[in-house]
Swiss-Prot record:
Phylogenetic placement of the source organism: Eukaryota, Metazoa, Chordata, Craniata, Vertebrata
Function summary: Plays a role in cell division and in the dynamic organization of the actin skeleton as a stabilizer of actin filaments by association with F-actin through Kelch repeats.
SUPFAM superfamilies on file: Kelch motif (SSF117281), POZ domain (SSF54695)
Superkingdom: Eukaryota
Disordered: region residues: 257-278
Entry protein name: Influenza virus NS1A-binding protein homolog B
Compartment annotation: Cytoplasm; Cytoplasm, Cytoskeleton; Nucleus
SMART domains: BACK (SM00875), BTB (SM00225), Kelch (SM00612)
InterPro entries, alphabetized: BACK, BTB-kelch_protein, BTB/POZ_dom, Kelch-typ_b-propeller, Kelch_1, SKP1/BTB/POZ_sf
Name of the coding gene: ivns1abpb
GO annotation (BP), single: proteasome-mediated ubiquitin-dependent protein catabolic process
Spans of repeat Kelch: 366-412, 413-460, 462-509, 510-556, 557-603, 605-640
Pfam families: BACK (PF07707), BTB (PF00651), Kelch_1 (PF01344), Kelch_KLHDC2_KLHL20_DRC7 (PF24681)
Amino acid sequence: MTPNGYLIFEDESFLDSTVAKMNALRKSGQFCDVRLLVCGHELMAHKAVLACCSPYLFEIFNADTEPQGGVSLVKFDDLNPDAMEVLLNYAYTAQLKADKSLVSDVYSAAKKLKLERVKQICGEYLLSKMDSQSAISYRNFASSMADGRLLGKIDGYIQDHLHEISEQDDFLKLPRLKLEVMLEDNLNLPGNGKLYSKVISWVQRSLWKNGDPLEKLMEEVQTLYYSADHKLHDGSLLEGQAEVCSTEDDHIQFVQKKPPRERDEMGSGASGSISPSNSQFNKHEWKYIASEKTTSNSYLCLAVLRGLLCVISLHGRTSPHNSPSATPCVLKSPNFEAQLEDLQEKLLKPMHYARSGLGTAELDCKLIAAGGYNREECLRTVECYDPKKDCWTFIAPMRTPRARFQMAVLMGEVYVMGGSNGHSDELSCGEMYNPRADEWIQVPELRTNRCNAGVCSLQNKLFVVGGSDPCGQKGLKNCDSFDPVTKMWTSCAPLNIKRHQAAVCELSGYMYVIGGAESWNCLNSVERYNPENNTWTLVASMNVARRGAGVAVYEGKLFVVGGFDGSHALRCVEVYDPATNEWRMLGSMTSARSNAGLAVLNNVLCAVGGFDGNEFLNSMEVYNLEKNEWSPFIEALGKN
């Protein structure tokens, strides 16, 4: 007896005994109210048990208001019956037992049923069994499952073991794009990923603008030209045609439109066949994975081209022709090229995906980079950078693909609001990331769709300010605050000037809204919000009008980097001192970056991603306050 007069007894064996009996009832078909038909095989179960385990089945059962004969029927035509039986046993006993040959099928079934914990355990098991012989097949599987976290770990393994992997049958059977790169005198191919980014840009241009199928590009050796100013040109430039390049607006169109021709790219033959399984993969993925030097001027690269895992063979040879560039340029010596390769090893680790219009924030001494868009798609993947290990890892992806949004940390959790999903749809929905559970949770929607809005945490509330109208052409004055306790949105005083793509940040209890654009005209004006009296005040204007800039508080001041001035992506940086109400210019970044992310990580200012006017970036660089300079090297990260 307890002092309050209640009897309290806990039977430690009851739970195990009960679930064992329930599982026995399931196997004998007793009291079952759901029939699972898996590829013609019938499995009986109890809806209450399955609904507690599987969000997918919960939604189905919740919508099934009139089951025939009191028994619901759910059909699965794409799952392994044995794998489903494994998951049913898990649902009843909390024990996962699967033969090693069945793990990938269990993973697929867990993904379908939204059993995230089981999916994660199966993924970790597969990784533990991966070797150079199985790496390619594992990568194909992870791609077919669209598992960004698993892909990231497999790609990391491939980068470390490419030489051994390249000797395996699975690698040798991959489709192959053969390139001959013409070089100016005294030039060598650079041994870094930038060359392959340019190659991927060329492939995309051929597929999108010329309508050539990928299979056709792989039929013959393709000729490209690498000039002394480190630009890659189409081989037809030798006959005077245009350079391989494009603008950010072109890239944004790629995000919103489907290709002019969608084909099932099927070939035959061991040397370059495109397998049926590959054709089912995500056709929107473009990625450089790894490369190795095979001879003095030849490289082997593993990449993903429009969702297809393939090999790119590059061989460089001196061009008998003159440079197609109209601008004279200084030739770099082979020694200089070798120095570039040495420096490449010391560069800060790039993100797995190039991203522009992404959300970034510092959380628990790590850098979070979420969503954004690249040349092909709007992303939902999220990466986390650990400065101690200099590595990016995937965390749980967002529920919705989104770009052109901002991110803020409030009460130890990450919030994202609005943006665009890449299909010309402005978003009103938002999400919150719980780092303890590694999951994204939906939050109450905004009252209106908001793309290119600023997001900021201030006085334990989340503020969303400005943004673009539904047509995406005019800025808004709207300002709204969200209370995470009451889950309610409240309208605040509007801005003085309509703005979209403004940089927004909190400093000393005030919210600053910096630059942006009213329609297409970029702004240099800055407004400051006082939450105590709900008023906006104009403060000193920036030196450079810009939209899509990054902003962060560093050493008690506002640092604004990059952006777009209406004509060019910017490298320039300026800082605002609230004590003097003045802006001054600082050292420029090493790369122009529009719509990049900016955050302070371990007292170091870090810029990541963005668009440089020609390419989407996955690189990072950091600022040295004492030297007033930016650097992309690991050494600079530790010396700030």
